[in-house]
Amino acid sequence: MRTLVMVACAVSLAACSSPPKPPTVSGRHRIPINSPAAQEELRLQVFPQEPTAQATMWPARPPKQTVNVYFPQDVTVFRPTSAQINQLHTLLWPVPKHINVRGLTDNSCPPPGDTQVARVRALAIYNWLINQGVPASRITISYAPVKDYASNAPLSPGRVLNRRVDIEILRK
């Protein structure tokens, strides 16, 4: 039994000590390593291209745009309609370089009253713009009771055009 174990150990040791057969190379998968195609393939393997997020491009805008917000007589509270909100949001993003807010009236009250109405309307728009995320440093307010009439008509339809706040958006 001992001899049998010794023979088995000798055979297994002899089998382990023989070198493995060399691999056979056919050469059909060879590519030149220095060719431009091979270098490009290697570059793509090392740095695979990741999908990049598309940058949001805003349409080209004119350097200056003016929006008029009209108010009923003696009303100073700004309650924008959904159409006004959509229009203003479209114009406000990306945030413009500067915004001029100018409150105007129809000259229906004595000058001190009209001045106060124009000022409060301009402040209402100013506060709304700040609540929408426009930095206060980019907004300038002005108001005038008797200036820049859109209509010189003394009747009510013409006066409606004068009761407004002009929002001038400057991009440059």
Curated annotation (Swiss-Prot):
It is a lipid-anchor. A lipid is attached at residue 16 (N-palmitoyl cysteine). A lipid is attached at residue 16 (S-diacylglycerol cysteine). Transmembrane segments: none annotated. Keywords: Cell outer membrane, Lipoprotein, Membrane, Palmitate, Signal, Virulence. It is found in: Cell outer membrane. Residues 1-15 form the signal peptide. Gene3D superfamilies: OmpA-like domain. Residues 58-172 form the OmpA-like domain. GO terms for cellular component: cell outer membrane. It holds the Pfam family OmpA. This is Type IV secretion system putative outer membrane lipoprotein BMEII0036.
